[in-house]
Amino acid sequence: MEKIIEEQAQDLEEACRDVPDVEVIHSGSGFEGLSLPQLIHGQTWNTDADHMIIKTSLKLQEVVKPEETGGERNIEEDQHVVRGKGSFTDAETDIAENVLFIYDASHAGYVHLSNKRPLFPTDSDSVREHCLQNSKFIDSSRKSVPFSHLYMRSKEGSIVGPSYSIQYTTGSFNVDRDFVYGLKCEQWPLQANEWILRDRPQSWPGFEQISAISDQGCHVVPVGSHMSHLREFEWRFSFSAAELILARSLADDQKLAYSVLKALIKSEMKSRDADVFASYHLKTCLFWLLEKRGINSWNKQSLGTNVLELLNFLIGFYDEGFVPSYFIGKNNMIDHRSPEDILKTCHALREIRDSVTQSFCRYIQYNQVLPVLFDTSLTQQLKKNPTKFLQNCKYNFLVMALAYILRPIKMVQMNISSRCLESAASLMKKAEILHKATREAGSQEYKELLSALSDALTPVENPTTNMVLSLLEEFLATDKMKVTESSAVALAVFNVFLALHPSHLHQGSETNPLEFHGYLVNPIFKDCFLWAAKVHERYCDAIYNFVVKKWVGGPHLITTDQEATKFMKLLMVILGKPTKQAGAVTGSLFRSSNEGQMFLLTRFLADYLLHVHLECAYVTFQATAFLMNKSVLSEIYLTINWGTYKPSQLRAIELVLSKQELQAELSEEDFTKLIKKQHELKTELSTG
């Protein structure tokens, strides 16, 4: 998701490169790392990104009344002082056409812009006569900055206030993009001086960060206050660039607490009659909380504690009917909402707080992010069978730990390896705690259990796939679960393998073939799929028998190899989809539906298995042939004739030559060509 957002940002910058006097500022949760992608329509992941288009040809200079600078006010002229680089101190000086003066509006956080000398009184008539109307600026900006060619993969956009919103779709991801036009204030505004000067007992943000933020100034965007009768002539200060700096300075745990709470609130508010909440309020609340409490205290607390503390802090703001802007504390961002609406939102947030575990369960169910899916939902388990709920969590922790161990190998990113292993170790310990709790029913109170889970940071040293698989096997043997639940665990392990197993499409296959081959045949991936096949046959053979009996016209996969037979049974269950978990085997860690793509998954799988288990590869080619309504030989020949990775081509030839039933389909000429190609490939690989 991050890569997609960055690519879109680069596309926008490229589009603006030939447009004179334009600068692009990127912000929003997608760039700040402050979001959990939301699943929409059960199919596509969704996040957001904001883009501010800055017209750099216009220069802004702030006007300061004498009483604000210690001088005496001339009531007759309402004389103003101009502040900023190249300030005009002589009222008779000609004003450049590209200079706009900033005058405070009636509401904190908002201003008027005018190209007139700073002499006129800022009453309503003067504002209407002399100040820039924000809608005219928006119209002229849209004409001068053509972005239409960026919307080719977007749904039709909509105009909401000062912004233009589109939904950009690519593959399995949607990005809600908001474009807003604005102007740059080179100097930090006087209205926000209090942010620089206020006392910070916890020293967050630090002096250097405050200086860096204030030195870069801010922006104004063409939107007026809801409380103003001059709204069309007002502009709002925007501190998006400053917020981006602050957000990116946060630790991952702090970002996660905010992201989880935002996701929960947005998900839960859909079914409630309360519309005051805005995610920007929560981000503002996060900054206020960190400033008052300090970031060190948050680093020492569990995720659940941080989420609840942030939620209580937010409720406190709404309770007071005052959500202060972080940079301009006098600006109450909800003063235009009725007390009744604010009260409804307070009530809704308290309900979420009082049932936060259920809210979280509903969120992860809706977004289909659990790798292991039991027959009953998490919320039902939590209400009716807490032991089953803990059991479900335990297996999900272990399967997620497995994914954390495999992911750095798949991504070949050593910089994330240590973090992933720490997460895997923590999840494994949590699973052990939950296993003990379910075996000793009633021995731990719920709060004690949560405390034990939050303390399980990195107690397992050097976690490995074998350690995870051994724990899973031990727990399955003692838990004696339903057949469908044991099947869910085995299939979830296989799905993690399917999502992360090596592929010849990896970028190192040509540049460093020896290193890539070592990665390709790494035994930990083979261990995972063979474990899943073995366990599924041991506990869930009844499901395979059900599929074979009920699937009229289904595939007839054949093999005489013992390990491949177990794998064949697992593959039949995946193709037959008799359970919810079988339907969720999509080769993705993040989605539960991938209709029409199974033939691609089996083709990539077959290509990988050629290198680690030839007989399992043969079974998979049979499955692909069934899905494509082709012969098995023709599917293997696709790899032989069109494959781009020579070792795969060679192994595919070896597979054909190892099977009499496949050789029988070859003409004498085809057989001769196959032997010749085998010789050529061996020669190329030995000399290369």
Swiss-Prot record:
A Pfam family of this chain: Mab-21_C
Entry keywords, A to Z: ATP-binding, GTP-binding, Immunity, Innate immunity, Magnesium, Manganese, Metal-binding, Nucleotide-binding, Nucleotidyltransferase, Transferase
Chain residues that bind ATP: 29, 240-243, 262, 279-283
Top-level class of the enzyme under EC nomenclature: transferase
GO MF annotation list: 2',3'-cyclic GMP-AMP synthase activity; ATP binding; GTP binding; metal ion binding
Catalytic reactions on record: GTP + ATP = 2',3'-cGAMP + 2 diphosphate; GTP + ATP = pppGp(2'-5')A + diphosphate; pppGp(2'-5')A = 2',3'-cGAMP + diphosphate
EC number, as in UniProt: 2.7.7.86
Names of the cofactor(s): Mg(2+); Mn(2+)
Annotated residues for binding of Mg(2+): 48, 176, 178
Keyword Transmembrane annotated: no
Binding site for Mn(2+): 290-291
PANTHER family membership: CELL FATE DETERMINING PROTEIN MAB21-RELATED, CYCLIC GMP-AMP SYNTHASE-LIKE PROTEIN-RELATED
Family membership noted in the UniProt record: Belongs to the mab-21 family.
Role played: Nucleotidyltransferase that catalyzes the formation of cyclic GMP-AMP (2',3'-cGAMP) from ATP and GTP and plays a key role in innate immunity. Directly binds some unknown ligand, activating the nucleotidyltransferase activity, leading to synthesis of 2',3'-cGAMP, a second messenger that binds to and activates Sting, thereby triggering the immune response via activation of the NF-kappa-B transcription factor.
Name of this chain's protein: Cyclic GMP-AMP synthase-like receptor 2
